[in-house]
Amino acid sequence: RTVGELIQNQIRVGLSRMERVVRERMTTQDVEAITPQTLINIRPVVAAIKEFFGTSQLSQFMDQNNPLSGLTHKRRLSALGPGGLSRERAGLEVRDVHSSH
């Protein structure tokens, strides 16, 4: 799966949590006092997105010990993770040095 699909799934999870909160508030609040501002809370959606970027295998903390380590970290590219290569399936053409180097 692509990164976009993974983020889309997380947003769906957040929206379903928000829907559950809205439905619960609609049953507990007075009909005359209900406004969109009192019903809708975006915290579940924000929490789902933060959870994805904080705990996903595709996210990394950037090495910022010094400017050179930050630069080399930005140059690294990993094709591992969900939907990518595994260490067992990576062939020689993937492990070989690219001709541009």
UniProtKB/Swiss-Prot annotation:
Residues 86-101 have a biased composition (Basic and acidic residues). GO terms for biological process: DNA-templated transcription. Signal peptide: none annotated. Keywords: DNA-directed RNA polymerase, Nucleotidyltransferase, Transcription, Transferase. Residues 74-101 are annotated as: Disordered. Its EC number is 2.7.7.6. One of its GO terms (molecular function) is DNA binding. GO terms for cellular component: DNA-directed RNA polymerase complex. It catalyses: RNA(n) + a ribonucleoside 5'-triphosphate = RNA(n+1) + diphosphate. DNA-dependent RNA polymerase catalyzes the transcription of DNA into RNA using the four ribonucleoside triphosphates as substrates. Belongs to the RNA polymerase beta chain family. The RNAP catalytic core consists of 2 alpha, 1 beta, 1 beta' and 1 omega subunit. When a sigma factor is associated with the core the holoenzyme is formed, which can initiate transcription. This is DNA-directed RNA polymerase subunit beta. It comes from Mycolicibacterium peregrinum.
